[in-house]
Amino acid sequence: MRTEDDSWDVTTSVGSTGLLVAAARALETQKADPLAIDPYAEVFCRAAGGEWADVLDGKLPDHYLTTGDFGEHFVNFQGARTRYFDEYFSRATAAGMKQVVILAAGLDSRAFRLQWPIGTTIFELDRPQVLDFKNAVLADYHIRPRAQRRSVAVDLRDEWQIALCNNGFDANRPSAWIAEGLLVYLSAEAQQRLFIGIDTLASPGSHVAVEEATPLDPCEFAAKLERERAANAQGDPRRFFQMVYNERWARATEWFDERGWRATATPLAEYLRRVGRAVPEADTEAAPMVTAITFVSAVRTGLVADPARTSPSSTSIGFKRFEAD
């Protein structure tokens, strides 16, 4: 089970999910009609080696990513999620955002595969061990970003706002943020601090997009946790329920709407249908995953955090309205 001060690298605990979703993106990229193309996902998987390279080479025919109901829909989910956030960034940059913040960046490759306007700076925040692996692979393969990229080594449960600003983020300029595949790995309290941090640093006109999940009934979660542990004893390596917090601080649409953002929610099932991917039947293993997840995007329209935006260490969450010049 998780603790508030636990740690990991790219192959352990929460960090290993970066390789899992990279493998899923690589499998999606191999399709004849991919929802998103990520050529660097395979690079990271092969650099890590082991099961992740073997899955892509077809050497693990019984691997959960390539067999049964779960594998098909999980790969579809990752393809759809990647496309959703890619489209979000396209809208945000078209609106003039030239500061991009990727929270828990992991093995995200958008700095390298998307087209960015001249003058864009991309801030990638994650634990030092994760960024060390990523940066080493990028250097080994001579992969260069398509915008200025700054790695910010910080635990998002700590004072990440200060680290971000110390690396050149300007809270007086609009910005685009994502929290993709992150919130379920944070306690409700850590989610609250994350939302407040975004709200404090985002000037008017800023964009944000997050992926959130509806918590399970506590008894249902406990039952799934017990079944997962039993499956582990039989050789199933999946430990999802042992890594997540079955908590949610607030619904993202409501929280951001109340603070001067205009938010829009898109359930994963709805988005899958929109992009032509199957939604799992209600009685299948993948159904609860798809049902629980919602994508939320928002644009800041008028309220900003108080006090001054140059003081990210402040815990005040009062608000004041920006007046037009």
From Swiss-Prot:
InterPro entries: Ppm1/Ppm2/Tcmp (IPR007213), SAM-dependent_MTases_sf (IPR029063), SAM_mthyl_Trfase_ML2640-like (IPR011610). It comes from the Bacteria. Transmembrane segments: none annotated. One of its GO terms (molecular function) is methyltransferase activity. S-adenosyl-L-methionine binds at residues 126, 155-156. Disulfide bonds: none annotated. Its EC number is 2.1.1.-. Coiled coil: none annotated. Keywords: Methyltransferase, S-adenosyl-L-methionine, Transferase. GO terms for biological process: methylation. Exhibits S-adenosyl-L-methionine-dependent methyltransferase activity. Belongs to the UPF0677 family. This is Putative S-adenosyl-L-methionine-dependent methyltransferase MRA_0901. It comes from Mycobacterium tuberculosis (strain ATCC 25177 / H37Ra).
